[in-house]
């Protein structure tokens, strides 16, 4: 997708700066991001049976994703601290990989979008799964982290 718009994080001199969103109206905004982790069949089966050595890896990954979304502004240098009004994290088996697919939906009402919070949540949730399972499967692969949907603000709705 190409755009004629300028990069908003560069000022007129080409220097990096944090965008001033102070005069933008507060609107409802939503973003959905997704990613996956591929693993050995044996590791996948351990998760499905609830027999992983470190306990409930799915619950820990959900909490990690939520924490990460709330701290996005501390991790991504030019992101604004925003107030999340809601968030859903869903982790589903993906038999064909074999592996897991992690989806995150974030919501806010404010002057800036919530895409980065959803993307960071997916990334950290998947990294947490890797961390908790690496002892049994160090060859796992994280991939396909992508924005699926965003809405709100001046650019309206975008879908992959």
UniProtKB/Swiss-Prot annotation:
Query: SUPFAM superfamilies recorded for this chain?
Result: Molybdenum cofactor biosynthesis protein C, MoaC
Mind listing the GO biological process terms from this record? Mo-molybdopterin cofactor biosynthetic process
Protein keywords: Lyase, Molybdenum cofactor biosynthesis
Q: Does the keyword Repeat apply?
A: no
- Polar residues: compositionally biased ranges: 1-11
Q: In which pathway does it act?
A: Cofactor biosynthesis; molybdopterin biosynthesis
Q: Which reaction does it catalyse?
A: (8S)-3',8-cyclo-7,8-dihydroguanosine 5'-triphosphate = cyclic pyranopterin phosphate + diphosphate
EC number of this enzyme: 4.6.1.17
Residues noted as binding substrate in the record, renumbered to the chain: 78-80, 116-117
Active-site positions, per UniProt?
Answer: 131
Question: Where do the segments described as Disordered lie?
Answer: 1-20
InterPro entries from the entry? MoaC, MoaC_bact/euk, MoaC_sf, MoCo_biosynth_MoaA/MoaC, Mopterin_CF_biosynth-C_dom
One GO MF term on file is: cyclic pyranopterin monophosphate synthase activity
Q: Quote any Pfam family the record assigns.
A: MoaC
Q: Which family does it belong to?
A: Belongs to the MoaC family.
Functional description taken from the UniProt entry: Catalyzes the conversion of (8S)-3',8-cyclo-7,8-dihydroguanosine 5'-triphosphate to cyclic pyranopterin monophosphate (cPMP).
Q: Assembly and interactions? A: Homohexamer; trimer of dimers.
What is the protein name stated in its UniProt record? Cyclic pyranopterin monophosphate synthase
Biological source species: Synechococcus sp. (strain CC9902)
The taxonomy runs: Bacteria, Bacillati, Cyanobacteriota, Cyanophyceae, Synechococcales
| Gene this protein is translated from | moaC
């Amino acid at each position: 997708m190409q755009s004629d718009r300028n990069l908003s994080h560069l000022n007129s001199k080409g220097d990096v700066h944090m965008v001033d969103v102070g005069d933008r109206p507060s609107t409802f905004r939503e973003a959905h991001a997704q990613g996956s982790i591929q693993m050995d069949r044996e590791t996948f089966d351990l998760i499905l049976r609830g027999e992983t050595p470190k306990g409930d890896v799915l619950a820990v990954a959900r909490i990690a994703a939520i924490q990460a979304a709330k701290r996005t502004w501390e991790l991504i240098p030019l992101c604004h601290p925003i107030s999340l009004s809601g968030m859903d994290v869903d982790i589903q088996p993906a038999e064909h990989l074999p592996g897991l697919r992690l989806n995150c939906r974030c919501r806010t009402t404010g002057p800036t979008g919530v895409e980065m919070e959803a993307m960071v949540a997916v990334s950290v949730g998947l990294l947490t799964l890797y961390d908790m399972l690496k002892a049994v499967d160090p060859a796992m692969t994280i991939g396909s982290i992508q924005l699926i949907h965003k809405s709100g603000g001046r650019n309206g709705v975008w879908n992959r």
